[in-house]
Amino acid sequence: MTKKAVVVLWGISQVEGVVNLLQE
């Protein structure tokens, strides 16, 4: 995996975590 791909996937996982917190 390229470094950019890792950063993108990490960012997506962070956003999903925030969305889950807001939905609860």
UniProtKB/Swiss-Prot annotation:
Highest taxon, organism lineage: Eukaryota
EC nos: 1.15.1.1
Enzyme class (EC, first level): oxidoreductase
Keyword tags: Antioxidant, Chloroplast, Copper, Metal-binding, Oxidoreductase, Plastid, Zinc
A cellular component term, taken from the record's GO annotations: chloroplast
Cofactor requirement: Cu cation; Zn(2+)
UniProt entry tagged with the keyword Plastid: yes
Protein name in the entry: Superoxide dismutase [Cu-Zn], chloroplastic
Species the sequence originates in: Picea abies (Norway spruce)
